[in-house]
Amino acid sequence: MTPHAPATVRRTALAVSTALITALPVLAASGSSAGAAAPAGPAATAPVATVDVPAARAGKKKNKKKGTQKYHHRAKVGAQVLRAIVLDQAPGVEGDKVVDLRIGRAAANINTRKASKAVSTSKTLGGRGLADTDLSGLLTGMVAKAGPEKGKEEVPSQTLVPVPAAPLLTLGVSTGETKARWNGPRTCVPGGKTVTSSSSSTADLAVLPGVIPGFGALLGLDGTVSATQKTAYLPKKRKAGLKAVATTGLADLGLFGDMVSIEVVSDPKMVATATGRPGKAKITYTPAVLEITGPDGSPVPIPTDGAPAEIGIPANPLLGLTIQFPGIINEKVSENGRLAKAKSVTLRLVVTLGGVTIADVAVAPLQTKVKVPKGGITC
């Protein structure tokens, strides 16, 4: 026997032991007796088929889930004429709650995980804690829903007759319309058509009219103002992106019965896009261009970096007014191109009386958000 024979014997014994160990699970699964273990060659292939069947099914489920993940996407968009928070210290406003008025809002949500995939709304007036004032005639909202099957829902333009709501506000004729469209499961609305669109407009708006004697409305907009939103897909070869647009159409503003006037030269607009490709998500914001004239008839310079500016009211030294141009106040864009979201406020007005804040007004707040899968939407 050569010096290498012992190693050869050990390898042979190991090979036999391995064959027996491999065969044992097959015998147990088939119920065969130990005497049937001799033909281990053919039986050794059985565990492969037995074990891999569930694994193959799990793989199919995983692939199916992965395919769904390549489709799921969502968007959120909103445009509003203004939001006014009036504190209970305001003269003439009774009740111990803060008044939160949301005037002229157009909004939408797209979420492929929901039963209603696309929801579009238009609302003339919303809010909470309305100081026990009856605003039921103004609280109108229009909603259009679409999905999961192919189809669309549209609420045509409706007109609201003016209803006085003193001492909080007055509104002229208001209108609204909304539409939502869906193209069916795992598909996208083609051809750049809007998935959602809505608008809300009102005329001759006055917030807290006559609340301070001799000064007219705290804030007035003479003319028609509006808020608009829309969403759509961005076709690109085989995979789509998503876009959301929010904008407002403002009228010139007057504060304290036009003691301070704000001329609107151009309106604000925000667009969010996401494609799922690196570097291809973005927020495009076009700020409003405003010109402000103070009580003495002189132009009022307002810092463009969002810093506040104080404006004195000589006719009533107890009144204080702070004006800001916040612009973009919250923005996030992912480097992988999957997410783009932002919020903005065109103009913020804080009014004090005797050092106490009585109103905080945000003019033309906008928000957009879009999120898509990596590489874009497979539809």
Write out the residue ranges for each language-model feature.
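Secretory targeting and sorting signals
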Residues: 1-40
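Extended, solvent-exposed, non-transmembrane regions
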Residues: 37-379
